[in-house]
Amino acid sequence: TLSLALESPYYIKNAVSDRVLKARELVLSQTHQGSALPASADAAAASLEYGHGRLGVDQVTAGGFDNLALLSNGLLSFDGDVSLNMGQSLRLYSGALNLSDSAAANSRVDLSAPYLLLAGILAPLEAKDQYVRPVSTGTPSQQATQAQFNASGNLIDVRGNVVFGSKGTLRQADNSLLSVERRGFDHVQLTSQGDLRFLAGAGADVIAKGISTQLLTQGDMTLRAAQLYPGTEVGARVIAGYLNDISGTSINFDPTRTLAIGRTGQGEAPVPYSAFGCLQLGAANIQQGGVVRAPLGLIEIGNLGASKVELLPGSLTSVSGKGLVLPYGGTVDGQVYKYNGKTVTFLGQGALVNENSDLSVGVILGGKSVQVQPDATVDLSGGGELLGAGFISGRGGSTDARYSPLVQIGANGSFILPGLGSNPIYAIVPGVQPGYAPVAPEGGAVDPLIGQQITIGAGVPGLAAGTYTLMPSTYALMPGAFRVEINGLAGLGTEGATQPLRNGSWSTAGRLSIAHTGISNSVASQLILTSADTLRRYSQYNETGYAQFALADAAKLGVPRPMLPVDAKTLKLALEPGAGADAFSFKGIGRFDAAAGGYGGTVAVLNMGSGNIEVVAAGKSATQGFNGVTLDADSLNAMGAARLMLGGLTLVKYGQGGNYITVAEGVNTPKGSITLREGATLAAPEVFLVSNTGEIVLEQGASINTLGRGKASYDARDGFTYQVANMLAVSNGLLNVISKAQAGGQTSGGIRLGVCASAPCSGQTALYSDGSLVALTDNAFELGDQVRYGTRHLNLGLNNINVGSPEALAAAAAGNRLPSGMTLTQQLLDRLLRGDTQVG
């Protein structure tokens, strides 16, 4: 292993010169350069340059190194064409990856290793005012470049602030600023034959809110892997075509640049050992043709200001936990559930933390145009299991055997307590082997080496002979798993027979190796293997899982349960106006089914600009003069969600008051008008139209039909009541609603059903459900003559109902004495009570 580091120390301001305040720059070239310095140190001192280092690939090759780690707390520059291939690992830590000043504009950088780590360094805040540190915290350079950066491996990890190209400033001794700029790359490509993982950076919010890791370039970027995903509870983003930040939630992109995601290998990779991560993909143009996952987490594509988002044929965009079985914290006393030492906070249905937050779990597709092409899959289905294990110290044992080596008896009969240095503890889990151990905030006794695996022969009951990836020891309680202790006290070369031990464990021989490298121990090590059932006899655990604890907690509080892995998630379409009828097209596969005991998934459509939304029949263009987002009804219906919501997002605060479903505010405030145009039909188990400020309109000839579409998501039978200001809902479920007064006395534009917005008009407006039909508004309600409806439960919630004959109501209106609300005549009352028996 060769490790080189070029650091940037702190200097006292009043005792520093500009000579030492140079940007730290480590230059990597294909061949090393001979030194031009004088032979003696004294003679060379005056010509030495601070903060500068250089390494040639030929030097690395000549040294026979399989592992290379380079750290520059500043710039890591490539001097022209560079091709570097390492036998085991390549780790690059830097403030920016860029070309050197002298490199050709069309330079090509090719890096490869079985394991590749790209890690960014974020400079910490300077220690008080009297210190200065020569670190440039810049953004990508916009200087012209035709350079190519290609990196490949069997596993690629990205951690921290990884920036290609740099433009920033350094503070000088006189407090002035010196500009520092290095060119980036026209195209960056990362190719992993296995996974491409995003690991946690220095802090949760160091790059943006909730984001600790990013890949950032001003040019095009292509990521190819068996699958991309963030680690457990990691917030990460990938940005291509970066120009500058507009706000904390929006970026100005180069309209000519593209972020492309591709797939390597055959077949679908198994769901990774990860939960509750967040991954944002941002560029003017995004082509998602690979496998992007964030199990039980959040994926955002185009939500930072994209022009066009395409989910390509064969792609998978998934936040489903189906197939995932993962150790995730636990509870000792049944009162508090903790992960990594912190109390776990549960989310209510809707997956928003509060009124002003955005979606925390689900998928967000944003931009002016979102196209889901044939055979592209968006998976928000329910599934997955988070296992709990809270160690109970007491009669079951005073130490947790997952973290402590077993006591041994020496040759003289004395007790020996090995340390983790000689006797590290891991776990192995039968089944499909991931090849590399997962990385998570809550680790095991010892972190396995990257790709570390063990080959075991036959003879241990319940464990087939084979090669297994060494996992963190917290996995030892998983179904079928084994605790693995490498008995370093026995030394190497142990080839003894597999035999049982008196404590229920087994002793056997195993050979350590590193995946995808050909590196392995030539001699075996003694292993102590302990099945999960036997491990439970060594130490006592409360194995209440995440979902089991959440259900018990809700029962204790007397409120509806929080969101669980079995629940399907929400797909938010965060669209911007400007694409006409091409704003959204869905021809792919939508998975919104819940696992057993779960709630179905939701599609929520929002116009992030004016808020105005219109839904037109298939093949129709945007309405002339309409200022908003135009959607094709067939595309909305084709997704197959249990709930279709236009205008807003639902919010449930778990805990006190957790019975009420409201609509989110902030960037998700329901605003503008929601219009269902003539000829358009919305069909789902339940359909909601909401607007706090605009009107809800169903034109004559438009319809909403939930008959035969299946079970709705959670409803009144699950303990929920909707509390909104202006909503039209057609549902196969049972809906309870109450009116919500808006802040500042604001009112909506009301609800109009069966109106003729532009003559000529034809057809009937139809509203049919197998459950509930709700019209709740704080303003006028209009029911046209051509409206037909059928439902089991009709609920009209209005601030005012004006009852009288047509003549009396007309006279009151003429005298400006008729308040906004519903005008109820005898004829209208008869219609409401009669309903429609033509359908269902």
Regions found by a protein language model. Give the residues of each.
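Extracellular and secretory-pathway beta-repeat/beta-biased strand scaffolds
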Residues: T1-G840
